A protein has these predicted regions:
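Surface-facing alpha-helical segments and adjacent helix-coil boundary elements at the starts of domains
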Residues: 1-217
Length: 217
């Protein structure tokens, strides 16, 4: 994803904005993802949301996009609990499914790497590009401190049939992730990532190849 996108609402019609905020439709572009008003979407998706959750969503509206998603995830888990967040993971709106992955990871951040990866795997293989991006952004902060363990656990993902899963194996630990904190250890010693990059460097999928190129550059 590029972080230098123009003002997200500049070219989005009011009717389309209303559809996005209602949760009736998926976003089609990054600009549409950025244009969503999360507090408005929440009131449509969870009309019985407690006031504390609504207030957290209002605060999230003014944050950067990654902080917005993290805040929504944590607030949803705090106020609605595990079962409700699992239900949201199957919602028709991509942003809501993104909230769910942040919510579930926020409560399992101290779990072992295999547990974390199993948790985000459905989102990593989601048909929507945005949800797939949220999946690695949600789990990356919890993989980075355990690099060797994470690289070992991700190695089998490099041979998965799904190009989405294979891409996740590379994207989740990119030394210079877009909108995500860099991983200094991999910037200093990028060769530590070779167990992931070697199997993927000649991947048949351009989607995967692009991630490997981004990892190296």
């Amino acid at each position: 994803w590029r972080s230098d996108v123009m003002s997200p609402t500049a070219s989005i019609a009011a009717e389309r904005q209303a559809d996005l905020n209602s949760g009736r439709d998926e976003s089609r572009t990054l600009a549409e993802i950025l244009a969503i008003t999360h507090s408005a979407l929440l009131t449509q998706v969870v009309p019985e949301a407690p006031e504390g959750l609504v207030e957290a969503a209002r605060r999230a509206d003014s944050l950067g996009i990654l902080a917005r998603m993290q805040t929504m995830g944590e607030a949803l888990y705090t106020h609605l609990g595990h079962s409700a967040c699992l239900d949201l993971a199957d919602h028709p709106a991509d942003t809501v499914r993104g909230w769910a992955v942040f919510a579930l990871v926020s409560q399992e951040k101290d779990a072992d790497v295999d547990t974390l990866l199993a948790l985000v795997r459905p989102a990593a293989d989601d048909p929507h590009f945005g949800v797939r991006e949220w999946s690695w952004m949600a789990v990356r902060p919890h993989l980075a401190p355990r690099l060797d363990e994470a690289i070992r656990a991700l190695r089998p993902w490099t041979s998965e049939p799904s190009e989405r899963i294979r891409r996740f194996a590379s994207e989740s630990l990119r030394p210079r992730g877009v909108w995500a904190r860099h991983i200094p250890a991999l910037k200093k010693e990028p060769e530590r990532g070779l167990p992931l990059l070697e199997p993927l460097r000649a991947d048949s999928s351009r989607y995967v190849q692009d991630s490997v190129a981004n990892w190296i550059n």
